[in-house]
Amino acid sequence: MGDDFLAIFKTRAIIIKTQDIKESDKLVWLFTEKLGKISTIAKGSKKSRSPLFSTTLQFCYGDYVVYKGKSLYVINESSLIDSFQHLLNDLNDLTYASYFCELTDIAMDDGESSRELFRYLATSFYLIRSHAVDIETLARTFELKILKTTGYGLNFDYCALCRKKITSFEYLHLQYLGGICRECDKENSMHISYSTCSALKYLSSISMENVYKVVLTKEVKEELYKVLTLIISQNYFRKPKSLDILRNLISFEKNKV
């Protein structure tokens, strides 16, 4: 029997995904502050009288006590900080919150932890609820943060090919994830505007709490979406399905009279 078997852990966590199993149990994927992404089982949580009923819904943010079973962690206790269930009442909020959870699930392996990314996700939920931030700009910022956290951050300081120092660029190399100087070959690169280059650089460095201060033009937001969607699609093992929903939402907003 391993040393971790029946070891008890208490950690702050956000529920990024759930799946019903059996009559009263469900699988719950937690993105935790201490243990990273873990798969758990919440026994009896589908019963309305269960103390886990209201704390094991998707988007819930709280403190969870878990122990390691033979194959999964088991949720033993939970204390809710914020359920974020109000996000279910707005299609836009629901879609973006679901996307952030899905992207976190795709980008992080089981047991892989990042306190920084955990803070980004929690902050994003509060910002979505506040409606004080442009949600597209928030999404692009979160994407840049998660790319950097998982080793796919963009290089803004040196040419991706010759390593010459650069301050801005018009072409982004898709394989080496960096700008290309004027002299180097532009094959396997994407042209971007100066404004989009500046936005990428700024959003990569800004704190999540200050995203509400950023104002971007519609053209820049569209180009950011294309660039980051492509980078995410080519670097993670699968493309988030929510991206397609986001595209439909954006198109819907454009066609509003």
From Swiss-Prot:
Pfam families: RecO_C (PF02565), RecO_N (PF11967). It comes from the Bacteria. HAMAP family: RecO. The gene is recO. Coiled coil: none annotated. This is DNA repair protein RecO. Involved in DNA repair and RecF pathway recombination. GO terms for cellular component: bacterial nucleoid. InterPro entries: ARFGAP/RecO, DNA_rep/recomb_RecO_N, NA-bd_OB-fold, RecO, RecO_C. PANTHER family: DNA REPAIR PROTEIN RECO. GO terms for biological process: DNA recombination; double-strand break repair. The keyword Signal does not apply. Belongs to the RecO family. Keywords: DNA damage, DNA recombination, DNA repair.
